[in-house]
Structure formats: C-alpha cells, structure tokens
UniProtKB/Swiss-Prot annotation:
Name the UniProt record assigns to this protein: Small ribosomal subunit protein uS9
Natural source organism: Desulfitobacterium hafniense (strain Y51)
KW Coiled coil (keyword) present: no
Molecular function as annotated in GO: RNA binding; structural constituent of ribosome
Gene: rpsI
Compositional bias per record (Basic residues), positions renumbered to this chain: 112-131
A GO term from the CC aspect: cytosolic small ribosomal subunit
Amino acid sequence: MAAQLQYQGTGRRKNAVARVRLIPGEGKVTINKRELAEYFGKKTLEMIVQQPFGVTDTAGKYDVVALAHGGGTTGQAGALRLGIARALLKADPSLRPALKRAGFLTRDPRMKERRKYGLKKARKAPQFSKR
C-alpha cells in the first residue's frame, strides 16, 4: 500500500500546543481520537477550528487528525486553527494571501502574566488600609 499524502502543521496559543495532520478526505475532524463536536462541545470553539477551511473554500476536502495538549479549550481551539492554517499552506501555497488577510498565520503572542511576590495575582494587590 502506498503512503498516503498528508500535510503537517503545528499551532500554539497561550499554553496549548496542537500538532495537526491534513489528509485528503471528506472533512472529518478528529482531535485526540475524539470527534470535534464531542471534544469541544461549544459551537463557537468548533467554528474557530473550522475557520481556515471557510476562508480558503477547502471545506470537505481534507480530514484533520490532531493532537492537542496544554492550556484550556479556547487556547487549544486557537492552536488548532493556526496548525490547520499552516498545514493548508503546505498543501497549497496559493492560499497564503487569503489566510494572511484573515490573520490565521499569525501566532498570538499574548501569554498569561506571571504572579509577582507581594501581590495576590499578577497585578492584584492585597487590600490597602490607610490606618
């Protein structure tokens, strides 16, 4: 059996990392061996993951097999979106302008700010009393 053609992409967002493989197929999305709807359970997060296909009119052309870990659900959805966009770019470099215009090729650099000593959270100070 011949090796099946597949494209890989890695996405990161906050503390989440997603390793994405695109395989020519009928549009099935599997994350950590679970269906997209079952994994996220929120329509908004499902939409975020599907966005690169909508922008490039490639919906239903590729199956997605992804491994996501770290962070929360929103971070993982963002990481998957970036990973899918990067994999689509490897599959068809002519999609670059559309993906770039939509902002799907940009890694969001915002991270959680570290907690400082003397404070309760990153910026929240303990209650101040004048007397």
